[in-house]
Amino acid sequence: MRPSKRAADEMRAISFERGVSKHAEGSCLVKFGDTHVLCTASLEEKVPGWMRNTGKGWVTAEYGMLPRSTGERMRREAAAGKQGGRTQEIQRLIGRSLRAVVDMQALGEMQITVDCDVIQADGGTRTAAITGGWVALHECLRWMEARQMVRVEKVLKDHVAAISCGIYEGVPVLDLDYAEDSVAETDSNFVMTGKGGIVEIQGTAEGVPFSEEEFGALMKLARSGIDRLVSLQKMAVA
């Protein structure tokens, strides 16, 4: 029995609230159960130096956690003077995931930065950030389209979403919260497009290796979860 009493293939309650920032061109507050992430998409009409005069745009991401997003207060990384390795890994993952579904040529020489700030963490912050980040990116492109800068459907080729899966007490389960994630025998994150393409898979065994059969079960769970997330994204931006 899962601590949350959810079925093995049951996700937490998922919600997207658009337009939560009056300043950002695109924004979304995404909730995966008790994991809440504020995603904002900011437009700059310039690109990094190494992309100038290419005719192509760029999408990048940054990630952070508020000090009291966790059970005990975390020290701000800015106070330490540098970002931790985990933060750098996650924000690179978010950026890669979003770029996988963006046509940089259609975007033109502009950059969109998607900032993902964890307000409350209960497992799966990176998957929530990717999934909500897509909604914020869509809203930014919609803002640009209203000003005849781009066409959303030309720039954004597909949906992208992410979900965690793991083996908890010997059973493959979908969308782990912290109580499960902290003791799971296997923990994995799947990033996929709306058309079923795989962007990234991260999988780690804790103590006991997992079998190919178990990996297949996790993949099946992930696909069902991604399908549901994409449906919710479509409803959110409709």
UniProtKB/Swiss-Prot annotation:
| Protein family (similarity comment) | Belongs to the RNase PH family.
Known catalysed reaction(s)?
A: tRNA(n+1) + phosphate = tRNA(n) + a ribonucleoside 5'-diphosphate
Q: Which GO terms describe its molecular function?
A: 3'-5'-RNA exonuclease activity; tRNA binding; tRNA nucleotidyltransferase activity
**Organism source for this protein?**
Brucella canis (strain ATCC 23365 / NCTC 10854 / RM-666)
* Top class in the EC scheme: transferase
Q: Which domain of life is it from?
A: Bacteria
What Gene3D superfamilies does this protein map onto? GHMP Kinase, N-terminal domain
The name this protein goes by in its record:
Ribonuclease PH
Where on this chain does phosphate bind? 86, 124-126
